[in-house]
Amino acid sequence: ATASAHEGEASYDGWANKGLEHYGSLGIAAEVLPLKTREDAHRDEVAAKLDGASAIFFSGGNPARLAQVVVGTPFWAALEIAIRAGLPYAGCSAGVACLTDKTYDSDSQDFDSIWAPGIGYVRDTLFGPHWDIVDTWIPGATDFIAGSVGLGDTFIGLDEDTAMVGDGRSWEVIGRAKVHVLREGEWTRYAEGEEIELPLPLADEAA
């Protein structure tokens, strides 16, 4: 819900409740972190919530706003440590798009202002959530985004209701549609059940 906090309490609560309802339907106890601002991300009691967590999930909203809230904060530093120790990270929409060096400001009105700094945890990579419907929102968006992928970088487009699940190096596609990978100018598309060998370069590994 952090990525939607700037939209107001109704939006934040809506995303939070969706998450609680989803995990509740699976019989999994879940808690919404009180993480709306950079001040929250500096509070020891928020980072302490990671202790004993079995997973962390960031939902949708504006990925640039999410990055602004957490990048360079004690919360994110603690989360990186937890991920290295084995804590699973899951994200949909903004929750995955925020992870890279640059991300999308989804409040922007045109392509010229769409790019913003991301968290920079996943390097040399760009994610494209909602890949199969992005052009219905902004005509020409898929061509623009794919054309913005840096030389030597990897682009990963994730269709609606589709996920890639793995250990950071090997992945399996789950869902109704596909994952689209652009590497060295070549597209490869993967459907449900197919495996992707794609190690994601992480900032903490490069340090």
Name every feature range the model reports, one short phrase each.
Residues 4-17, 21-25, 103-105, 109-207:
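C-terminal and late-domain segments of enzyme folds
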Residues 6-65:
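Portal/gating segments that form or line small-molecule/metal binding sites
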Residues 31-34, 57-58, 89-92, 155-158:
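General beta-strand structural signal in soluble alpha/beta enzymes
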Residues 44-47, 79, 115-117, 145:
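Short, flexible, glycine/charge-rich loop motifs used to bind or transfer phosphoryl groups or to couple energy/partner
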Residues 47, 53-55, 64-85, 196-201, ...:
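Mature, structured domains of secreted/extracytosolic soluble proteins
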Residues 59, 65-136:
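Class I SAM-dependent methyltransferase SAM-binding "motif I" and its flanking Rossmann-like core
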